[in-house]
């Protein structure tokens, strides 16, 4: 990949991120709402997945890799399974046991 192609790809990615954040994301909690213990949205949900899901990969690099992947596209992992996790854990009540049920499909284990 040439330098100009790489630059164009990065610029388009940043433009997409700005457009998405300026129109709002329905899967992140408003700043005016108080966080519940069992309701998690966006980065909070990714953090819960990192803590709850077992991994066969190296422990040192896996959480940071998962967080970086999610931050690239505002909860990319949450969009993979048809917003089912968002419905269970962001919009509604979600227990840790229920969230553990999504580990295999989300992390490809």
Swiss-Prot record:
Residues 25-29, 57-83 form a propeptide. Residues 1-24 form the signal peptide. Transmembrane segments: none annotated. It is found in: Secreted. Expressed by the venom gland. GO terms for molecular function: hormone activity; toxin activity. Belongs to the insulin family. This is Con-Ins K2. It comes from Conus kinoshitai (Kinoshita's cone). The lineage of its organism: Eukaryota, Metazoa, Spiralia, Lophotrochozoa, Mollusca.
